[in-house]
Each structure stands twice: as C-alpha cells, then as structure tokens.
Amino acid sequence: MSMNSNVYVAKLGKTVGLQGHLRLFIDSDFPEQFKKGVTFTTNRNLQLKVLEYNSSRELVKFENYEDVELAKKLTNQELYATIEQTKENCKLAKNEFFWFDLISCEVFENNLKLGTVKEIHRYPLNDYLEIITDSELVKKALPKNFLIPHIFDKFILNIDIENKRIDVINSFDILENS
C-alpha cells in the first residue's frame, strides 16, 4: 500500500518502562482513533495493532512488542492510517473536513476560479489553505500561489467535498496583494 493512500497520524518516541510502552506524539485532531485493536502502518511498512493506549500519559503499546527491547525497534517510526480507517474512526463536526478531502478542491470567488488547493498549513492561530493560482490569473501577472485562512464566514463560504469545490469571499484581495 502506498503512503499516498495513507494519512500520517503520529510518531513513536522512546520506550517508557519495561513492558513495551512507547511515547506517542499525535499529529492528528482525532486522538480517539488510537484505541485497542486498531492497526496502523509504519513508514517501514510494519503493521502495528494497538494493545493499549493511555491518553493521559500519551503512551501506546502494540501487539507482539510487549518487551522493551522489541519496542525500542519502533522508536522514531511514523504511524499511518488508511483513508477509509480515518473516515470510520474520526467523527467530524459541522464545517470540519479531512485535509485529504480538501486537497485538489477547486476554489471559486463569485464563480471566478482562483485556483486549486495544494496543501493545508497549520499555524498556531489558524489553518491555511495553500492555493495554486489558476493559470488564467497567473497570465495576468498574479502570484502563482497564495494562502487563504481556513475561517468560515470570513473567508470560506461553502465546502462541497463531493464536487471538489470551495466557495470563498475576500480571497481575491489576498491573491492580488500576495
């Protein structure tokens, strides 16, 4: 399975104690996906099944790695979940979307295509959509890419995942001034 069909969710740190627990550095908005019985794939293509997860101590233990020496071999590995697994285990609230669903959406303001979402960037106050500007606008000497704050009502009006379309406001001004 290619890493492109998987979603990066966490990194494993050092072992803690003698029974195979590892520090878990979660890089996901959904810590609830780390529950007993769930399987993740590592960047070394290992399949790891969660045996225990302690959210308050941020520790995880995997099946067949219940020994500190075995668990040490997992240090610094990245954990990935499949897109299907992510959708099944992570429940979204209103106006919440998976980043992988936003990537490649076309962005429109008043039916003018501004571009396509390339990436999402996390900053302390807000997330930002990185937009690759539509080629017709680049021909008019506008920047090749720009960032739109992921803030509903102020910049984002509507996100239609099924049609891969995001309608925005106040974003053409950002493009012009980028």
From Swiss-Prot:
<comment type="subunit">
    <text>Binds ribosomal protein uS19.</text>
</comment>
<dbReference type="GO" id="GO:0005737">
    <property type="term" value="C:cytoplasm"/>
</dbReference>
<dbReference type="InterPro" id="IPR009000">
    <property type="entry name" value="Transl_B-barrel_sf"/>
</dbReference>
<dbReference type="InterPro" id="IPR002676">
    <property type="entry name" value="RimM_N"/>
</dbReference>
<comment type="similarity">
    <text>Belongs to the RimM family.</text>
</comment>
<keyword id="KW-0698">rRNA processing</keyword>
<comment type="function">
    <text>An accessory protein needed during the final step in the assembly of 30S ribosomal subunit, possibly for assembly of the head region. Essential for efficient processing of 16S rRNA. May be needed both before and after RbfA during the maturation of 16S rRNA. It has affinity for free ribosomal 30S subunits but not for 70S ribosomes.</text>
</comment>
<protein>
    <recommendedName>
        <fullName>Ribosome maturation factor RimM</fullName>
    </recommendedName>
</protein>
<dbReference type="Pfam" id="PF01782">
    <property type="entry name" value="RimM"/>
</dbReference>
<keyword id="KW-0963">Cytoplasm</keyword>
<keyword id="KW-0143">Chaperone</keyword>
<dbReference type="InterPro" id="IPR036976">
    <property type="entry name" value="RimM_N_sf"/>
</dbReference>
<keyword id="KW-0690">Ribosome biogenesis</keyword>
<dbReference type="Pfam" id="PF24986">
    <property type="entry name" value="PRC_RimM"/>
</dbReference>
<dbReference type="GO" id="GO:0043022">
    <property type="term" value="F:ribosome binding"/>
</dbReference>
<dbReference type="GO" id="GO:0005840">
    <property type="term" value="C:ribosome"/>
</dbReference>
<dbReference type="InterPro" id="IPR011033">
    <property type="entry name" value="PRC_barrel-like_sf"/>
</dbReference>
<dbReference type="GO" id="GO:0006364">
    <property type="term" value="P:rRNA processing"/>
</dbReference>
<dbReference type="InterPro" id="IPR056792">
    <property type="entry name" value="PRC_RimM"/>
</dbReference>
<dbReference type="GO" id="GO:0042274">
    <property type="term" value="P:ribosomal small subunit biogenesis"/>
</dbReference>
<dbReference type="InterPro" id="IPR011961">
    <property type="entry name" value="RimM"/>
</dbReference>
<feature type="domain" description="PRC barrel">
    <location>
        <begin position="94"/>
        <end position="174"/>
    </location>
</feature>
